[in-house]
Amino acid sequence: MSPITLRIVIFLVLLAHGIGHSMAFFPAWGISSTENWHHRSWLLTPLIGDKASRVINTILFLAAFLGFIGSAIGLMGWLVPHDLWRPLAIPSAVISLVALFLFWNSFVAFFPNKIGAIAVNLAVLVCLLYLNWPTETDIGY
């Protein structure tokens, strides 16, 4: 695979993963909500209440959304310095995992998507922290 092709594939994965986090905004912001798609946390809502849970939902999912979008465009060197794509992707993956854990029951209808999101988060962490992949040469920098 050529470096530009690999860079585009990683860009699309990070971008799609980031956009996927926007699904949490709809119920948290009152745009759409059902019994199987809401902003309540199985752990936090009983402890701190509905409003605080909504705020934490928004903060976590918005941080992951912005972090992955920033990482994707940084990877390409658009608007965000290229050197920041890794430092944005790593905490975004951790934040996403925390958000998915805390709000696991919030998106019952999206169960396969949650499994995919966990897989992408773990892939980001393993590739960037453990394997140190991709190298700058691998992605054409």
Residue ranges and their predicted role:
Residues S2-Y141:
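Membrane-interface extramembranous regions
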